[in-house]
Amino acid sequence: MSNVIKPVGYKALLDMRQTEMGIKLIKEFFQANLSTELRLRRVTAPLFVLKGLGINDDLNGVERPVTFPIKDLGDAKAEVVHSLAKWKRLTLAEYKIEPGYGVYTDMNAIRADEELDNLHSLYVDQWDWEAVIEKKDRNLAFLEGVVRRIYAAIRRTEYLTCEHYPQLKPFLPEQIHFVHAQDLLDMYPDKTPKEREDAICKKYGAVFVEGIGGKLSDGKKHDGRAPDYDDWSTIAENGKMGLNGDILIWYPVLERSFELSSMGIRVDKESLLRQLKLEGKKDREKLYFHQQLLNDKLPLSIGGGIGQSRLCMVLLHKAHIGEIQASIWPDEMRKECEENGMNLI
């Protein structure tokens, strides 16, 4: 059964040639903006990592990575990355990056268990970034400051795109609104987490939802997070739990909330041990990445991922991510999309 949203009367505002040129424009301009805004150096990223080192991103903990044996390593298993959340932190240490500086990558990943729809594809491309911070920076005020700078880079890119293609009109608000996942639950107790995001994004246009990963007052999580990169359990200065979150916008083309980025201040030793215990994953303490962190071999950091195809989709006013990137889609979805003005690559 296709999960595709079919906007009534949708017609792409750019043809395929303009779309390809627009993708290039957005990717080059935003990447340069992100790099200068956060003082990030580009580094080359892996497509796969060895299994069993604890380096791959476990996402919500249930998605299966694509694996394959390596003949020259005695059929040792490699995993195609889900993201580079933990790999980047190892890279900060390897490159001896100073506080206030960081790295970014062009990350390509395969998520074979993704539920395919307008926003979700088997193929994931994002700017994965990570920056070194000091202990004094592990607070909500610092996190929100970084979010504002990323959002400013997104809005500058929107302005440039609309200047190049006057048929596209800017819609992102000037400011991004901050709200904790617990406050969302209190505001909309009868709604699901996704419905809460829709409601708050429709109200403010752009929102950073904080504290994703820990249990809320109803005993449920707003959404899942792996226990070993984002710090979702430390009590922040507002008295609430979590130093992480998602950048969401209201996307008028699909009339729904739309996640552009997941990011956060990363775990220190204390929060790593606490979160592994909370999630029943204490056995991970012996893995390579976790040992490096527990033995003070890794710097404190903040980081996240920003969807490349998603950002292009939004700024080019497309209704399906398949209008931006080449991937595999069910025949039924391709047919539905074609009938409703969405020409999938």
Outline where the language-model segments fall.
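Class II aminoacyl-tRNA synthetase-like tRNA-binding/catalytic domains
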Residues: S2-H120, D128-V132
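Generic recognition of stable, solvent-exposed alpha-helical segments in well-folded globular domains
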Residues: M21-L25, F29, R138-G145, Y288, ...
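Generic structural hydrophobic/aromatic packing signal, biased to beta-strands
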Residues: K24-I26, F30-L34, F68, A78-V80, ...
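A generic secondary-structure signal for well-formed alpha-helical elements
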Residues: L34-R41, I150-T161, A319
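A glycine-rich phosphate-binding loop feature that marks nucleotide/adenosyl-phosphate handling sites
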Residues: L47-K51, P166-L172, I212, E332-R334
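A translation/RNA-centric and nucleic-acid-associated enzymatic feature enriched
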Residues: I110, A181-I345
